[in-house]
């Protein structure tokens, strides 16, 4: 039996951990200009350099940009990236993303230096319009001295190492199976309700407004409440009310994926699992004091046949994003590191 040295085992664990971590970062739809698409200047660099990070996420996946740190003085453009985006690679046509891609939600920011955002991310919204790209930029700027023909400094100029983030927003073939309680004609959800119109027509009717959707394996589901309403339960899609009105943890019954709980915009999304073993009904509520409750009910149905289920499942397998690999590689990296580190101490 070959006996491995501690240094050798630790070396293996370190290399595997780094390789899998790099793979993870790529699969996680992250444009990392600090460590992957580096924007550092090379010695004697005289011209600007551009690097492109192109990502093609699926709906509801998270895209992240890392631009600068406490040691890297990079600038993100626009500074409000993901709230605002550019519509072209030449940093023109600045758009508010909620107007450019209707249904956008879940922006997250992280600042490692004062008054500067270094990391941003957002979830890819359901999009019924044709596929479209959006852009943000990360820049590292430097002023250099240009020597004249005699070798003496003659002028100064700025050079820029620029990272371009190109995100292709995919297009859905059908609307999200869900309820929009803010408009009678929803651009995202399959059903729409205008609360003002309903209230005017039925001012004396105190019955709650119930919107029911029938969904199957892998279907996108969701709802949107008016801005002055609250959502019950607060963590809808993690938990929900059953038909008895009891709040239940859905993970014990129906493991939903790609959950987005955007309380700022009162918009919630999720996806049904690829396998549903039994019919299941649950609901969440938009509520406001002294107003009718707006009830979003989901009837999740077991597939009618194994053939149909297999067909839907295989179709979905092609659609599954690289984030599944991310989770696997994360565990592999961690477990590999632990095992090889342990071996280094016992061998």
Curated annotation (Swiss-Prot):
N-terminal signal peptide: 1-23
Cysteine-cysteine disulfides: 31-53, 67-138, 81-136, 179-211, 225-286, 236-284
InterPro entries linked: 6_CYS_dom, 6_CYS_dom_sf, Parasite_Repro/Invasion_Surf
Sites where a glycan is attached: 28, 147, 200, 228, 242, 265, 322
GPI-anchor amidated asparagine-type lipidated residues: 322
Keyword Membrane on entry: yes
Protein topology in the membrane: Lipid-anchor; GPI-anchor
Superkingdom per UniProt: Eukaryota
Pfam family, one: s48_45
6-Cys domain ranges (all copies): 27-172, 175-305
Record keywords: Cell membrane, Disulfide bond, Glycoprotein, GPI-anchor, Lipoprotein, Malaria, Membrane, Repeat, Signal
Localization per record: Cell surface; Cell membrane
Propeptide: 323-347
Single GO cellular component term: side of membrane
UniProt keyword DNA-binding, yes or no: no
Subunit note: Heterodimer; heterodimerizes with PF41. May form an antiparallel heterodimer with PF41.
Protein's name in the database: Merozoite surface protein P12
Organism, scientific name: Plasmodium falciparum
Recorded name of the encoding gene: PF12
């Amino acid at each position: 039996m070959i006996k491995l040295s501690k240094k050798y085992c630790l070396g293996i664990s370190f290399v595997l951990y780094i390789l899998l971590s790099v793979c993870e970062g790529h699969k996680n739809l992250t444009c990392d200009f600090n460590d992957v698409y580096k924007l550092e200047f090379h010695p004697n660099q005289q011209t600007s350099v551009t690097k492109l990070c192109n990502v093609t996420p699926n709906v509801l996946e998270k895209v992240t940009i890392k631009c600068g740190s406490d040691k890297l003085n990079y600038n993100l453009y626009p500074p409000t990236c993901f709230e605002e985006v550019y519509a072209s690679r030449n940093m023109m046509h600045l758009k508010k993303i909620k107007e450019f891609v209707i249904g956008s939600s879940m922006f997250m920011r992280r600042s490692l230096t004062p008054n500067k955002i270094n990391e941003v991310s957002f979830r890819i919204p359901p999009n019924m319009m044709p596929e479209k790209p959006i852009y943000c930029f990360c820049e590292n700027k430097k002023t250099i001295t240009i020597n004249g023909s005699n070798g003496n400094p003659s002028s100064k100029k700025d050079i820029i190492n620029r990272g371009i983030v190109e995100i292709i927003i995919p297009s859905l073939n059908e609307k999200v199976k869900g309820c929009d309680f803010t408009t009678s004609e929803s651009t995202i959800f399959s059903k729409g309700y205008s609360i003002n119109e309903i209230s005017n027509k039925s001012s004396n009717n105190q019955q709650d407004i119930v919107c029911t959707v029938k969904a199957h394996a892998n279907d996108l589901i969701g709802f949107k409440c008016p801005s002055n309403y609250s959502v019950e339960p607060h963590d809808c899609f993690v938990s929900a009310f059953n038909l008895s009105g009891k709040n239940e943890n859905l993970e014990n019954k129906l493991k939903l994926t790609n959950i987005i709980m955007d309380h700022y915009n009162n918009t919630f999304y999720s996806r049904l699992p690829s396998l549903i073993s039994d019919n299941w009904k649950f609901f969440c509520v938009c509520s406001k004091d002294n107003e009718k409750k707006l009830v979003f009910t989901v009837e999740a149905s077991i597939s009618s046949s194994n053939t149909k289920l297999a067909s839907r499942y295989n179709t979905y397998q092609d659609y599954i994003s690289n984030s599944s690999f991310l989770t696997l590689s994360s565990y592999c990296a961690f477990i590999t590191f632990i095992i090889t580190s342990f071996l280094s101490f016992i061998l």
